[in-house]
Amino acid sequence: MLPCFTRKPVDHPLGFLVALSGLLMQLMSYGIDNSYSIFSDDMHKDPSLGYPSVTTISLGNSVSLGLSPAFGVLCGFLVDRVPPRLMMAVSTLMLFAGLWLSSTFAHNVTAVTFSYCLLASISSACMLSPGAAATSSWFNRYQGLAMGINFSGGGVGSAIIPSLAGKWVVAYGWRKTFRLMSAFCAIGVVATLLSARRAPPKKEEAGPSEYDEGQERQEQGEEEQAHTDEENRNNNNSNGETTPARRGLHTHKLNPWELFLTMFSRAFLGNFFCWLIFSWAFYSLIYVAVPYVSSMGKAGTVYADISPIPTDIASTLFTFYGVFQIVGSILVGWLATGTTNEFAYVLCATIGGIFCAFLGFCRSYVAFALLLCVIGFCMAGMFAVMPALIAERLYGPNLGFYMGAVFLAGVVGGFSAPPIQAELQQRHYGNYTYVCVFMSACMTLAAAVCYITMWRDKRVRIVSAAAEAKLA
């Protein structure tokens, strides 16, 4: 976008076009990345790869999904200093190159991991923080809704690309399917052209009503942080220390040491652990969904007596999952705008945890579809609210870094969940019940962490501020 278009007041409608660019980037990236487990069986039977084991193939999924947050920290640091569209262009190019390199030159699963999965991981990192940071710069009042639109792209991609990939891999094999999927990278080109960070308007050009409303919203957030900031200063001053990093968090670009110090604040740690615990459930579901459903009727498993569900049919469940991710992202974003981000997150995590437990009892296609609709809705809502939670507490010129640093927690779940879950179900004769219980526990614990570290603390600050205002 040209500077004359980006120099707009807070909450300007043009910001929704930037949110749309984030949606398109996530459609491309997550739609392709989430399809990887669909190729597991075809790669396992491929003589050109040496018939690799399922666990070995799952390591590629770990690299693709798990290392992305690690690269995201660097990308978050860079997006505070370079235009978001540059990062998005790199993301599109890396994903396109990975699909073609692996499908053309890979002759073992290790080559697939390094030629596709590693590049896909970097690609995902280059689009997530830039898209979220660019969108958040346009909004205060409607930030929850805008983030919901931005993060609904994963649902759109999951509804479209995996179902197509499931049909293509049966008809053409994984190599040609990779090349066909590369056509979706054209979406990334369009998204790159639409993305831009908002530039503050000149005072004489800014409409007083819209601009002042955005400023009032930001000042309210600053007041909510005042109580916590004062406690941190008092604690540090009692030890003979000063807190320049904490004082300048929202107003100055911090140096690496100051950024490191702020990572021990309650605002950062609360967001970090919410994402850390949730990532276990999310990446477990992405990896096991299709293998779990397609194991129905498979000999040698506890589901041998169940009516079989072929892989190409099982992959279509991502359509239901993806559609309800779209609905969940937008509706939960709207709910967060009308209530609080913390309430929306806790509600989605609690309901999602309950239905993850029920997933272990499913045996039919219809039952899987119904539960994945609810789980997709809840997980998408958590995805949409998470950046808003980060922006609400860590807003300012360092927001891109904090986005990437919080998403770094996903390394734990993304990198370790797929091989652990693959090994877990194999040790129990293909029984996925343990995986479902684990996902349920993680979702529930994420809700508890959000309530303890953010929602309850926010309510206490608001009540205290209201009491002080009443006494004054």
Swiss-Prot record:
Entry GO terms, CC: plasma membrane
Entry-linked PROSITE patterns: MFS
GO molecular function: riboflavin transmembrane transporter activity
Residue intervals annotated with topology Extracellular: 33-58, 107-108, 166-179, 293-315, 363-365, 421-434
Membrane topology field: Multi-pass membrane protein
Subcellular location: Cell membrane
Entry annotated with the keyword S-adenosyl-L-methionine: no
Pfam families associated with the record: MFS_1
Record-linked InterPro entries: MFS, MFS_dom, MFS_Riboflavin_Transporter, MFS_trans_sf
Gene3D superfamilies hit by this protein: MFS general substrate transporter like domains (1.20.1250.20)
Residue positions with a glycan: N108, N431
Composition-biased stretches (Basic and acidic residues): 214-233
Residue ranges of the TM segments: 12-32, 59-79, 86-106, 109-129, 145-165, 180-196, 272-292, 316-336, 342-362, 366-386, 400-420, 435-455
Residues of the signal peptide: none
UniProt GO BP: riboflavin transport
Positions of disulphide bridges: none
Similarity comment: Belongs to the major facilitator superfamily. RibJ family.
Stated role: Transporter involved in riboflavin (vitamin B2) uptake. Also transports FMN and FAD.
PANTHER family, alphabetized: RIBOFLAVIN TRANSPORTER RIBJ
Protein name per UniProt: Riboflavin transporter RibJ
